[in-house]
Amino acid sequence: MQNLFAKMGFSHLYLSPITCAREGSTHGYDVVDHTKVSPQLGGESALEDLSRQARSHGLGILLDIVPNHMAAHPENLWWQDVLRHGLESPYAHWFDIDWQPASRALQGKVLAPFLSSSVRSILLREEVELFFNDAQASIRIAGGVYPLKPGSWPALQPAQLMSYYDTATQNGRDRVHELLRRQNYRLASWRCAAKSINWRRFFDISDLIALRIQDREVFDAVWAEDRPC
């Protein structure tokens, strides 16, 4: 195929983003891991093989990358660590988050405007599932999964916790609501993003959070994989 492109007069092969994107991505711009070539595209070995073949036919490779943002998605481990540990996360300042915004409710927190409606209304529909183990816990609410801050839930056995946070009861819903208030993020309706969001997005897309790529530590981490072939 590369030989055909060379005969047609092409000088380069253009590749859309090749690092790991969220599952089901059709374009690769919603990156969840900048440090690896996507296994779905063949991984590092496939890229090296393509580079060798292209070079043997006099072709270069033009690689499209997106170092300025990532997907705000559960598959993004940097993002998940920020949600779980807040300012204590080593990645807290890798994303362009305003940790001290004008809103007192968001100071030291990240707005998570990913819900279809308010938390209260969602709890009434019982769209909540909790996952606990000895060290970590997560909550599934309205189809999204969010990590819980360590120590933000009572020291009970998993079965007891499920009963304690049973959203079929008013007490259970109140407890889940209070649990969410203790987190390093504030879950909210997507409608809140326009006025209240405290982190830089890619344009107005709340699924894509900006990186502080101008900071050397972030730059080096992102470019670890995006090196010349």
Where would I find each of the regions flagged by the language model?
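Structured alpha-helical segments in the cores of large, soluble enzyme domains
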Residues: 218-228
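Acidic/aromatic-lined carbohydrate-recognition and catalytic surfaces
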Residues: 1-203, 211, 229
